Amino acid sequence: MKLKETLNLGKTDFPMRAGLPTKEPVWQKEWEEAKLYQRRQELNQGKPHFTLHDGPPYANGNIHVGHAMNKISKDIIVRSKSMSGFYAPYIPGWDTHGLPIEQVLAKQGVKRKEMDLVEYLKLCREYALSQVDKQREDFKRLGVSGDWENPYVTLTPDYEAAQIRVFGEMAKKGYIYRGAKPVYWSWSSESALAEAEIEYHDLLSTSLYYANRVKDGKGVLDTDTYIVVWTTTPFTITASRGLTVGADIDYVLVQPAGESRKFVVASELLNSLSEKFGWADVQVLATYRGQELNHIVTVHPWDTAVDELVILGDHVTTDSGTGIVHTAPGFGEDDYNVGVANGLEVAVTVNERGIMMENAGPEFAGQFYDKVVPTVIEKLGDLLLAQEEISHSYPFDWRTKKPIIWRAVPQWFASVSKFRQEILDEIEKVKFHSEWGKVRLYNMIRDRGDWVISRQRAWGVPLPIFYAEDGTPIMTVETIEHVAQLFEEHGSIIWWERDAKDLLPEGFTHPGSPNGEFKKETDIMDVWFDSGSSWNGVVVNRPELKYPADLYLEGSDQYRGWFNSSLITSVANHGVAPYKQILSQGFALDGKGEKMSKSLGNTIAPSDVEKQFGAEILRLWVTSVDSSNDVRISMDILSQVSETYRKIRNTLRFLIANTSDFNPAEDTVAYEELRSVDKYMTVRFNQLVKTIRDAYADFEFLTIYKALVNFINVDLSAFYLDFAKDVVYIEGAKSLERRQMQTVFYDILVKITKLLTPILPHTAEEIWSYLEFEAEDFVQLSELPEAETFANQEEILNTWAAFMDFRGQAQKALEEARNAKVIGKSLEAHLTIYPNEVVKTLLGAVDSNVAQLLIVSELTIAEGGAPEGAVSFEDVAFTVERAAGEVCDRCRRIDPTTAERNYHAVICDHCASIVEENFADAVAEGFETK
């Protein structure tokens, strides 16, 4: 027998290298075959509900890192709730209707307008489902646990029927109406857009300053007066029907030198405009409040048959322009509101493709709206006072990336104004994990207009509206419920397969259709109405979920998207918000903080991370960042996270190896019988348990990450495990000292594995497979540990906090000795301590081998003052010299008692007593010398 075989060197097959990329899929298959998700739900039946409702990603293409961050975050929350006494099923979902899928088919050569609509919709459905399958595998590969075989998909018959019923309830309450209000219009998509489908970019536009001649000054202005107007959308002058001024803004009537004409502009802007127009020696003839100019009549700059009325509007400012804006009710929300209130015509001079129509005038007809500036300038003639190019923030179609326009077209709207206050009141009841999120959503609802819910596309859920022969819209409780039942049985495609009369209840009549003829609506619903109905299609309709949901967790862009639409439809139907809490996340940026873009080549695909590092590293990264704000990710950042993972893994491997001969049922030492240092580590660990439990409850992943890494690096690696080898390797295998420490090791190992499970389920299960004494066959079926409290724990914490300060001072003294070449490593040291009474009391209180704690071979606590040259601190001083004696071949300490034993071992007296007691046969035979 060799001497080193008398050491209790930890033994384990748990690999140092994780091999995550190859092992994770194997484990995931094992979990699926073991039906772990289903077993977890069965275990939690009857417990309090926790419903995290999954916001549906759009089913198009493989997932990106933003998807991964979101789904991993949800998985961590659901797993932690499932292990904390909650019934927390997770139903993943997908959003499947809308323009992107139509665009994909178009790129594939499918010509929608040249084929049967039903066949086209079947192609859309087929493609959408293929993308659901693709993304499902992507999400499962991340280790996300959920009911993957029974997800919700917005194109399924049951979901579409639920959506129709949401619409029906809103129609019954009078919230659905048809109007020709201006809406965001995408000429590139040939469809209206919702606010959530808009993004803003800088756009270079031509702005014009021009003048309208006064036709009827109402006794205030003469007819040789011109009112100066500013516009950044010259094409809308073709539909201008009024000029709007601010009621409380001061305006001046001026005449520049050399001009026969008089002009009206905002007083505050006169100086800057005079410079812009080249006016000199401007004479101010009069000053008016805006309300004095109300109802003055001017003439359209080139269409003299059109009068333009001066009206009042709150939206007019003196921040830029002239303080007067031309008003085209067909091309702007503010214009529409003040225009209709004053009886102005709602003229629309641009068609759905952005082409100017005949009513714009023969010079404009057929031109693209954005190309008419030269024609407008020509028509204005000497009424044009100035032009300039400006860069301003402008709305774009978020899918086609093309600028959009406001355009009044007949659309279906969901009223928000009719129950706005009710929505705002519900927002006050929701818990927002970011206060700014509450403000953002509140302001959006407060300021938003009614919701245009109709779209002029094909792939979507039809609006369940019929028209009588006289054009009267029909959407009764009876007709809508009948459509819902048809969709539930056949899917919404039946709308396109059948004639209107075959979609109505049998025997249905209407006074507007004396001949029994009906038409059906051809517009579909906004996709935000699809996903915004999920609270009904999923949370209400799935028996395992509970409405309202406890939590919605999505990106911060969803304040204008899913959070918004879900809130409106839920309050409209039931008077309550669909969620109790909102947690929002920022965007994933590259390592430099730049937005990820395929064109920039700075994207990171989750699949690439899985191949190089494993999904576990992506999961750990999610906890390492504050995802309430924008976060950074790169392969370099992931390498750093991987290094942290390696430290966690190797620390736990040490615990596994050094408890391999520990049977918790037989070998556990009661807390009261532990050494002070072991009690301290137990108390510290339970502080960690509480911190992590609380952080899981508050969805504070970064807190978990920091607390866990700090405990492993500082409490374990840099302290407890640093001197542990002197106990667990060297003392007798069954000695009290070793069992005391193993008790702490095992407790930490089991509980930290459970605490890690929501974040690192693959690694946790791998560790669990080595814990043969634990009852559950999978750690995912266990519960998170509860934090314990202990008698005198504050006293223990205070004692050891003081000792850690003392230890830091001792380490500085040892470091100085090392630098002076007195010693090499600390085990070569004889440390002499010169304590005051406080430190002397402290050293007596730790009831442990202080030399062992400081990892020195010899320690002396001296009486009296410290000699000259000692390393001194306020309460203590140290001297360091090389320890006397020889190195023990077994414990590696330098000890005066180290000697050649008659059984061929050069060991100290302490090791000799251990060897002679535990290895009598080897002592009798003598140890091998080679």
Swiss-Prot record:
It is found in: Cytoplasm. GO terms for biological process: isoleucyl-tRNA aminoacylation. InterPro entries: aa-tRNA-synth_I_CS, aa-tRNA-synth_Ia, Anticodon_Ile_BEm, Ile-tRNA-ligase, Ile-tRNA-ligase_type1, Ile-tRNA_ligase, M/V/L/I-tRNA-synth_anticd-bd, Rossmann-like_a/b/a_fold. L-isoleucyl-5'-AMP binds at E554. Gene3D superfamilies: 1.10.730.20, HUPs (3.40.50.620), Ile-tRNA synthetase CP2 domain-like (1.10.10.830), Valyl/Leucyl/Isoleucyl-tRNA synthetase, editing domain (3.90.740.10). It comes from the Bacteria. CDD domains: Anticodon_Ia_Ile_BEm (cd07960), IleRS_core (cd00818). It is an enzyme of class 6 (ligase). This is Isoleucine--tRNA ligase. Its EC number is 6.1.1.5. Catalyzes the attachment of isoleucine to tRNA(Ile). As IleRS can inadvertently accommodate and process structurally similar amino acids such as valine, to avoid such errors it has two additional distinct tRNA(Ile)-dependent editing activities. One activity is designated as 'pretransfer' editing and involves the hydrolysis of activated Val-AMP. The other activity is designated 'posttransfer' editing and involves deacylation of mischarged Val-tRNA(Ile). ATP binds at K598. Monomer. PROSITE patterns: AA_TRNA_LIGASE_I. A motif ('KMSKS' region) lies at residues 595-599. GO terms for cellular component: cytosol. GO terms for molecular function: aminoacyl-tRNA deacylase activity; ATP binding; isoleucine-tRNA ligase activity; tRNA binding; zinc ion binding. A motif ('HIGH' region) lies at residues 57-67. Its cofactor is Zn(2+). The lineage of its organism: Bacteria, Bacillati, Bacillota, Bacilli, Lactobacillales. The gene is ileS. Keywords: Aminoacyl-tRNA synthetase, ATP-binding, Cytoplasm, Ligase, Metal-binding, Nucleotide-binding, Protein biosynthesis, Zinc. Its main location: cytoplasm. Belongs to the class-I aminoacyl-tRNA synthetase family. IleS type 1 subfamily. SUPFAM superfamilies: Anticodon-binding domain of a subclass of class I aminoacyl-tRNA synthetases (SSF47323), Nucleotidylyl transferase (SSF52374), ValRS/IleRS/LeuRS editing domain (SSF50677). It holds the Pfam family zf-FPG_IleRS. Binds 1 zinc ion per subunit.
